[in-house]
Amino acid sequence: MTENIHKHRILILDFGSQYTQLVARRVRELGVYCELWAWDVTEAQIREFNPSGIILSGGPESTTEENSPRAPQYVFEAGVPVFGVCYGMQTMAMQLGGHVEGSNEREFGYAQVEVVNDSALVRGIEDSLTADGKPLLDVWMSHGDKVTAIPSDFVTVASTDNCPFAIMANEEKRFYGVQFHPEVTHTRQGMRMLERFVRDICQCEALWTPAKIIDDAVERIRQQVGDDKVILGLSGGVDSSVTAMLLHRAIGKNLTCVFVDNGLLRLNEAQQVMDMFGDHFGLNIVHVEGEQRFLDALKGENDPEAKRKIIGRVFVEVFDEEALKLDDVKWLAQGTIYPDVIESAASATGKAHVIKSHHNVGGLPKEMKMGLVEPLRELFKDEVRKIGLELGLPYDMLYRHPFPGPGLGVRVLGEVKKEYCDLLRRADAIFIEELHKADLYNKVSQAFTVFLPVRSVGVMGDGRKYDWVVSLRAVETIDFMTAHWAHLPYDFLGRVSNRIINEVNGISRVVYDISGKPPATIEWE
């Protein structure tokens, strides 16, 4: 038996903050398993989960409103440490007898909090000292309401000029509340505070490490599928690749991967996938040449949403046909990751935890009665990448920029044709190659080329030619919800443009997209 890596676990109750998933990722980075649940859980669910500690997240609502969310009362009766963050602190204060008021002054941004009383949460943690030797912490505030009276059995640990209770604590019960966000990097000692809570106060061991996660996943796969055969749609993306490697380690030749080349992949990508997973790692792969079938289905279609649906539908058809050719396959594997699971479980009060399977592959044929294997469903994307490295996948592949599921189908604007895809593949490869050469690839979050179905006049030698236009796109973002266009050097852009126009016959003009998100989206379609 492998070690029980879920033995120590933190429960995070989500009150709707944009940072809640970040809290969970930080706890995982500390080597401790945690789960994110909607705030409206029942006592029975908490008892069954049996957490070592509970974190109450921030949230956009006001505790002063009558129907705003509250933590289940059992949270404060379970006998485990509780850590309230921002809204979580406010609801803790209100529920335990303190008082919260709306404030005219919204506190948003950097603040310095002064530690005025000793607490296990911040003992020995400081950014600087006041003139009389009191610890100061640089933190990130984002709140309107504030606690104006703490419960009678709590003490004030830290305050700012306009936030008298920036940290409150009941050391005996191990209840702590902070009015700032320890999970964001702007709170410089935030990770140390979370570590203090999770590792010291809750006494969780760091069992959640890539090597142990792999051992646990392999054992669970073997227990689930036994000697049965499993099929997986391998795309060459991060999630399906790591899923393939885990399954291969667990069940070897009982895994069959189906790789569908839809003609909408990057330059030489199909060959790279076959070389790496087939030749190098020795996986059992069925390679389906599907380019013509996808292009035929897309013929004459200009609408982006319709193109996505067609590509998805044809993929499912092809995958199903291949699955039916295989004898006795009992299980379908998918690269579902934890954010997919959270998304599908979004709280509808009372039905918070009906977690639907998040189908990447779409509907399977009625005649195929298959179970579902999802070895990554507990993991965040950054954890999936770390596991991939541990399993021997190359860094460049795991940390490559995101590529849309429909591939070039949504980077060729309007109707998709083979000619357009071939031109775009070559132009995009030049852009990416130059980014690597200039050491800029890892400085931008995503970079790609878009094919515009418009002809523009160009000059070649003594002649004029009407050829196609491509746009380069590069953005910087933390979460892909908002993004800035990347200010790439002019001489770099000039070099890329010259190479594309000179080396890709059929392109006469290169433009650079300087739109942010919002108002534009990152992808053009």
From Swiss-Prot:
Signal peptide: none
UniProt enzyme class: ligase
Domain Glutamine amidotransferase type-1 stretches: 9-207
Superkingdom as given in the UniProt entry: Bacteria
GO molecular function: ATP binding; GMP synthase activity
SUPFAM superfamilies listed in its UniProt record: Adenine nucleotide alpha hydrolases-like (SSF52402), Class I glutamine amidotransferase-like (SSF52317), GMP synthetase C-terminal dimerisation domain (SSF54810)
One GO CC term, this protein: cytosol
Pathway(s) per entry: Purine metabolism; GMP biosynthesis; GMP from XMP (L-Gln route): step 1/1
Gene3D superfamilies recorded: 3.30.300.10, 3.40.50.880, HUPs (3.40.50.620)
UniProt function note: Catalyzes the synthesis of GMP from XMP.
Subunit text: Homodimer.
Protein's recorded name: GMP synthase [glutamine-hydrolyzing]
Organism listed in the record: Klebsiella pneumoniae (strain 342)
